[in-house]
Amino acid sequence: MAAKRPAAGEGGGKAAAGAAAAKKRVALVNITNVAAAANNAKFNSATWAAPVKKGSLASGRNVCTNRVSAVKSASAKPAPAISRHESAPQKESVIPPKVLSIVPTAAPAPVTVPCSSFVSPMHSGDSVSVDETMSMCDSMKSPDFEYIDNGDSSSVLGSLQRRANENLRISEDRDVEETKWNKDAPSPMEIDQICDVDNNYEDPQLCATLASDIYMHLREAETRKRPSTDFMETIQKDVNPSMRAILIDWLVEVAEEYRLVPDTLYLTVNYIDRYLSGNEINRQRLQLLGVACMLIAAKYEEICAPQVEEFCYITDNTYFRDEVLEMEASVLNYLKFEVTAPTAKCFLRRFVRVAQVSDEDPALHLEFLANYVAELSLLEYNLLSYPPSLVAASAIFLAKFILQPTKHPWNSTLAHYTQYKSSELSDCVKALHRLFSVGPGSNLPAIREKYTQHKKFVAKKHCPPSVPSEFFRDATC
C-alpha cells in the first residue's frame, strides 16, 4: 500500500524539487514486514511507507489538482507513468474555515437617572419661566428627599450622605483584602443566567424551533451507531491501535488534498471503527478499508465527491477499481446502509455556537482550537470509550481553558445546551489535555501541520501543565 504524493511545485524546476525534497512525508505502503506487536506498541511510519516529496505550506502542501486529467492518465497508462502535477495549477490545500454566526445577547437595560430641577438661564422664545419651573418641582417632590431650591449646596450633600450611610449601613471596619481579586487563582463556576441561543428565527439553517429536538435525536442516535470499545483486543489479530492511527493520519492528508469537508473525515473514521468492530482484517487490506470508507463518506457529504479512480491513484494504484468497489459493498452491507451517524463534529458545531454567545474569546480562535482538539481525538483508540457528544463538549472545555486559563471554562449556558456538567467531563478533558500537551507523535504529523497553517495557527498554543480540579466541581445554588 503506497500513496505517492509529489510536491506541489514539482513542475516548477529542479530547484523547487530540491527544496521540497528537504522535507519529506511518508505515506502508507505494504506493511506485511511489520511484526505484530502489542496493542499500544509504537510503529515507525517508515515501515509503512516510501519517502515522498513534500512542498512548503506557502506553495500548497501536497495538492492533488486537475482530477479529470489524473483519472484519465491512471486508467490509460501503468502506475509508474502517472504524473498529475506537470502542468496542473497550484492551489492551497487548506479547508476554508466555517465561521459561525454569533447571536448577540440581550443588551443590559439602560440606567435611569433622575432629571435635574435646574433650568438653563438662557433667554429664548421656548424658555420656561422660573415660577412655572418651581411649581413643577413642587408637584414632583418625593417625601424621601428634601429639596432645597435656594439653600447651601453643602447642606444638601451632607443630608444625602447621612441618608446613604443610614440606609446602606456601610461598615468602615470591613476587610477589603478579602474581596480583592487574585488574577492567579482560578475563578469558581458561578450560577449565571442562561443565554437563549435559539432565538434567531429568520435564518432557516439554524432551525431555531427544532434545534432542541434535533439535539435530543442525535444524542439518542449516537448510542446506537457507536463502534465497539474493545475490538482491537477481541476481534483484530493483525491490526493494532498504532496502525489505526497511521491510517487515520494518512486519511487526514487525503481529505486535505481533495478539500473534503470535515464531516467526511469524521464519518470515515466512524465507518472504519464500526466495520473493524465486527470483521477481522489483515494489515494488507487496512488501507483498502480506509479508502472505501472515505469513498462512502464522500458520496454522503460532498457535492462533488472524488471518483473511484482517484482513490486508486492516491494509493499508487495498489488496489484496482474492482477491489475498492468490492470493499465498499462489504462495508455498506455490514453497516446495513446506516451511513447517517452522529459524530463529534455534529455536536461540536452546535457547542461552538453556544460557547460563542457570551464568550469574550476570539470566535475563530475558539472554533479552530476546539476543532483541533476534536480531530486529535480521532487518532486515539482509547477515546472510543467516550461518546461523540462528550468528546465535543470536552473539546470546548479544553479550548476555553487554553485561551483563558484562570477563567472557569464551563457556564450555565453550556451546561444547559450540552446537558453535561463539568464533573462529567473530567476524565475526557484530562485525556484530551494529555494528547494536546504531548502531541500525537512525530510519525503522525498531518493534523498538527493542518492546524499550524497561518489561517488556523492554533496547534502551537501554549497549554498549562494541568487543569485545576476546581474547574470540575459543579456549581451549587
From Swiss-Prot:
GO BP term, example: cell division
Any GO MF annotation of the entry: cyclin-dependent protein serine/threonine kinase regulator activity
InterPro entries (UniProt xref): Cyclin, Cyclin-like_dom, Cyclin-like_sf, Cyclin_A/B-like, Cyclin_C-dom, Cyclin_N, Cyclins_cyclin-box
Tree of life domain: Eukaryota
Keywords of the record: Cell cycle, Cell division, Cyclin
One protein family per Pfam: Cyclin_N
Cellular component, GO annotation: cyclin-dependent protein kinase holoenzyme complex; cytoplasm; nucleus
Annotated signal peptide: none
Keyword Cell cycle: yes
Family, similarity comment: Belongs to the cyclin family. Cyclin AB subfamily.
Protein name: Cyclin-A1-2
Source organism of the structure: Oryza sativa subsp. japonica
Name of the gene: CYCA1-2
